[in-house]
Amino acid sequence: MKTFLILVLCLVMGSCVSFSKRMIKEDLMVVTKDNVNLIEGKYYSAGYEHIDSNRNKSEKVEGFSKMLSQKSIVGSEEIDKVEIKLKPLAKNKSYQLEFRLTKNDSLKYVFRHNAKLKKGLFLLGNYTSECHGIPYLLGGCQKFQSRMGLTKDNHLLVQDYYENSGGALFIMWAGYSINYGEKYKRIQ
């Protein structure tokens, strides 16, 4: 029984969100406390480059609203621009990012995420975890989180992590994890 509890504890603790920096490191501008305001600005909501976990680049993009939410209520055709405003919070390296989504300069949606500045990127507080059945016995869990930063050309970079894990009685293990990113051109 003690061994079983230790095994379950190891699985739960070991299944944290894990971003891969190698896919974005060649075009990443490191954001620090001194240049954190550079993230503020207007960007096109349609990405210009999609990067998968194997560092393959393509023009097939998800769109800004889909990248920040696993279950986006905002369709990519409903918006054409994103404005980001930054507000420092009391905690060290903690910020609130406000996203103003517009279509033809008409405001459509506003939402906010708290973020922590880690390793030159903003780790957003949009972490979601949904479990079905009895996780790792007869079910699984899905986890999602985003982080964002800037490219060397001052464009917006959003990176997502998605994990789907589970199994049947610890015998038949099933699951996968995906890292992917998209870049969005700065307007101003």
Report residues per predicted region.
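Surface-exposed beta-strand edges and their flanking turn/coil or helix-capping segments
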Residues: 58, 111-114, 124, 137-138, ...
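Predominantly extracellular/secreted and cell-surface proteins with exposed
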Residues: 87-132
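Sec-dependent N-terminal signal peptides
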Residues: 4-13
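Amphipathic/hydrophobic helical signal segments and adjacent flexible N-terminal regions
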Residues: 16-86, 90-92, 128-131, 142-147, ...
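Short, surface-exposed coil-to-beta transition loops
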Residues: 108-111, 140-146
